Regions:
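Helical hairpin unit composed of two closely spaced alpha helices linked by a short loop
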Residues: 27-55, 59-68, 76
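The conserved cystathionine-beta-synthase
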Residues: 9-27, 52, 73-93, 98-100, ...
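Bateman (tandem CBS) regulatory domains
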Residues: 1-7, 60-71
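A glycine-centered beta-loop-beta connector
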Residues: 23-26, 31-47, 87, 96-112
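Short Gly/charged-rich anion-binding patches and loops
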Residues: 18, 38, 61, 82, ...
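Hydrophobic pocket-lining "lid/loop/helix" segments that shape and contact the acyl-thioester
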Residues: 2-4, 17, 28, 38
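Short, flexible active-site loop motifs that bind/organize anionic cofactors or intermediates
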Residues: 6-9, 38-39, 73, 104
Length: 120
């Protein structure tokens, strides 16, 4: 699991351009969108492709307008095997948002993290 500064995140007031910079700098193919410190959504490479395909000038849009409001979330005390099962549940995803018992952002995990740990 990635934690702290290694977790890509932007506030829900960020622009799409700011979110892309954060995504690119952290190498997870997504950024978590927060509102007052709580998880508000996620913006993934797939969301970016859909946004660009929709036409108009996407760089003028706010991240809150284009994020996925229902990210796949797992609790910090769950097993790595649970992460795999959740990622494989349709529609399949490659990243999970990790929250603590209070529901606050604790980190993020990418399928590549599971590969490196030899979980899959």
């Amino acid at each position: 699991m990635r934690t702290g500064a290694a977790v890509p995140s932007v506030p829900d007031t960020a622009t799409l351009a700011e979110a892309i910079v954060e995504m690119s700098g952290k190498g997870m193919g997504m950024t978590i969108v927060t509102r007052n410190g709580a998880v508000a959504g996620i913006f993934t490479d797939g969301d970016l492709r859909r946004c660009l395909g929709a036409g108009g000038d996407p760089m003028r849009r706010g991240i809150a307008d284009v994020m996925t409001r229902t990210p796949r979330i797992i609790e910090v005390d769950r097993l790595a095997a649970d992460c795999v099962l959740l990622m494989e549940t349709p529609p399949k995803v490659t990243q999970l948002v990790v929250v603590d018992a209070a529901g606050a952002l604790a980190g993020a995990i990418h399928v590549h993290d599971l590969f490196r740990a030899r979980v899959v």
